[in-house]
């Protein structure tokens, strides 16, 4: 592979991961503490014809939009990485890119709840909220499966320079998947939250190790 092209691509991916993680933390904080009340305040504002509260716009629309934008940048960076890695590793990176595309689609579908809130109908919010939630969950599960397969192939690859980092990414993805299950079980949400933090840290460290890995000059993938 072309060492310079690979390094540039990995640096961009790492930056995308970092930005996504920071925005994800901010979105989670707002989701945990004010998103529900903010959504209700927005609904009340729509019904009464008053201006929307800034906290509502921030938690329900602005932060999620920023997360989507960061994930789209992540997808673009993975596309560059797929062109820079050894041809043996191209399918795995493309599968990871597909997983991120599914995550972006899931996030965009999730943003549709904002349009439902604009209707001002509590019944519509409850019904469509459930439908949107199920659709997002299905897409997220498929994305996680693709992610696990991609990381599994990269950590076992003989041509991928950052195998040690890929191992951490694989572990982090498993933890994140388990946390998603735990988060749906009453009274286990706290454990799931701790696991999500651990998965995020492993994701950052994993890509950092890949970023700092030694690269040998070989033919780049077409």
Question: Where on the chain are the PLM-derived regions?
Answer:
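Short hydrophobic membrane-inserting alpha-helices and related fusion/pore-forming segments
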Residues: 116-117, 123, 127-133, 179-195
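Membrane-interface extramembranous regions at the lipid-water interface
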Residues: 1-31, 35-51, 62-113, 135-179, ...
């Amino acid at each position: 592979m072309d060492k310079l092209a690979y390094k540039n691509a990995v640096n961009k991916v790492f930056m995308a991961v970092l930005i996504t993680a920071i925005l994800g933390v901010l979105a989670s904080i707002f989701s945990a503490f004010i998103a529900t009340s903010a959504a209700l305040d927005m609904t009340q504002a729509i019904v009464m014809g008053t201006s929307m509260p800034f906290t509502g716009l921030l938690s329900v629309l602005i932060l999620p939009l920023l997360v989507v934008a960061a994930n789209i940048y992540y997808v673009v960076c993975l596309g560059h990485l797929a062109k820079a890695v050894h041809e043996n590793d191209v399918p795995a990176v493309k599968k990871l890119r597909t997983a991120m595309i599914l995550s972006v689609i899931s996030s965009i579908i999730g943003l549709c709840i904002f349009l439902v809130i604009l209707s001002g109908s509590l019944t519509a919010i409850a019904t469509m909220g459930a439908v949107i939630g199920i659709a997002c969950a299905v897409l997220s599960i498929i994305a996680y499966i693709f992610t696990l397969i991609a990381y599994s192939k990269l950590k076992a690859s003989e041509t991928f320079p950052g195998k040690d980092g890929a191992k951490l990414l694989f572990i982090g993805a498993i933890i994140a998947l388990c946390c998603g299950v735990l988060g749906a079980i009453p009274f286990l949400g706290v454990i799931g939250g701790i696991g999500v933090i651990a998965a995020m840290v492993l994701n950052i460290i994993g890509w950092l190790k890949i970023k700092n890995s030694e690269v040998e000059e070989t033919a780049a993938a077409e």
